[in-house]
Amino acid sequence: MPLFIAFAFLFIIPSTAVLISNNSDFGTTNFVYSQPDHMNSNVTNSLNIQNIPVKKVHVGDIDIAYKTFGKGDPILLVSGSSSDMNAWEPSTLRNLSSNHTVIIFDNRGVGNTTAGTKSFSIQQLANDTAGLLDALKIQKADVLGYSLGSFVAQQITVTHPEKVNRLILLGASCGGKEGVPESPQLVKFFSEMVNKSINNIPITPQEVKMLLSIPMGSAWMELHPNFLEAIPEAKDLFAGIPSNTIKQQNDISQNWMATNWSGICDELTKISNPTLIITGTHDNNVPTANS
C-alpha cells in the first residue's frame, strides 16, 4: 500500500479474521474465524511508546533506527510498505511487551533509517533485518511481518532460518505474479491521496473514511463508526505526518514495488517454523486468497 497514513491503524483486524496455523505451538485448529476482542486494559497501560527513545545501530551500509521495550522472549516487528515504526498500533505494542521484548524499527530509507548505497529489494531488506538482530546480539526471535513486512519476514525465514523462532504473517502473500492483484481503482485512489499529501492539499473526511475502509472493510466500519476515538494515540499519529515524510516514504515504496519481488511461493516448503497467518476476510488491499 503506497500511502503511509493508511497504516496508522496497523494490527486492527477487520470484523472477521481468519487465523491459519501450521503448527500445534499456535494451537491445533488450522482455521479459526474470530471476532476481535477488546485489548486487556490492565496490561502495561503506563507504557508510552512515543516516549521510548529512538536508538541507532550501524548495519552494513545503513544506520537503522529502532526501539526496544518490554520483557521476555524477543519479538521483531517488520512494518508494511512506506510505514515507519510509529505506525504500529500503540495498545497492541503494550500488550506484546507484557511478555515479550519488542523490537520495532524503520526499514531502509524510511523514517530515521538511512537509505544506504545498496539497491532496494526484499532480499536486501531481509538481510538488513537479520543484521539488526545480529547487531542487537539477539540469536533468535519471533518475527511478525505485516503486508510488505510479511514478504521480508518470509524471506528471512528462508534465507536466515536460524534467526527465526516463530513466524507471524499479517495481511500476507508469498509474492510473485500468481496472486490476486490489487484493484486498479484502489491503486489510482492511493496515488491521488499521495499526491494530495505531498502537495499539502487537505484530504476530505469522506476520503479519510474511504482510506480506512480499504484495509478495514466497509462492514467493519459500519459496525464500529466511532472506532477512531477508541485509539487516540493512533489518531494523533494519523494527524501528525509531515508531507515531506509522506513523499519520502512514497518514493521508497515505489522503489520497492519496482523491484518486482519474484516471491517465495516455490520455497514455502523450506519453512518448518511454527507459523501463524492472520488475514481479514474484508481486507480489500490484501485479498484473503493471497494469504
Task: Say what each PLM segment does.
Residues 139-181:
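Conserved hydrolase catalytic core segment
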Residues 284-290:
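Conserved alpha/beta-hydrolase "acid-adjacent" motif
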Residues 271, 277-279:
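Short beta-strand/loop motif that positions the catalytic acidic residue
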Residues 205-251, 257-262, 267:
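Conserved alpha/beta-hydrolase catalytic His-Asp/Glu region
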